[in-house]
């Protein structure tokens, strides 16, 4: 059997930013769009491994956010990046995919949640190691991230050593936070995956997203898991793929807000 051809392409966002992307054709009508974490790229080994694993069961589109890798523009840390994801969703539709899922890691998690809540157009959302709110400085790792973003020296180091170009202007208006956007995702199914050993965002962020969201939703708090792509092993990728196949195939329940007391956490073992 001839192996499908991997296609690299450049997409252009609504505000004119060129986005470097790649398409891995899959065996089904399901496309999984990967939204990477801050300072990463679809070409980084940890992201490429996940893309290839998802590709065993679905088509995959991976791309570099603005200010990252070969994409143009400057990073706005999850604000304007929803337009980057939106052009990737449009690309998947143009390729003929009938079911589209957005899977985001860390910063990419905030993007997939905000995109689904504010713009829409996807059939399922997976948030992995994402924040529930902005400006969190409760861990040493996040204090370092804020220094890199807010100071000239930090942005210089990030540009030259991590190949990530950050907008020096900051946010003129504070974007809708992830938890607020999560409340608007239903009836699209939402899966929230978070490790109890995440050194950036503790599990409270996942619970904040979960409690804000309406059904259908699911929360996996995973013992021993760290943060984002590096902590997402092949077994977890496979379980997410299975969840996506079931969640998009099954009809969505009534989107009425559930009683918070009846909300359940599913903790994979």
Regions found by a protein language model. Give the residues of each.
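Short beta-strand/loop motif that positions the catalytic acidic residue
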Residues: 185-186, 192-194, 198
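Conserved alpha/beta-hydrolase "acid-adjacent" motif
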Residues: 199-205
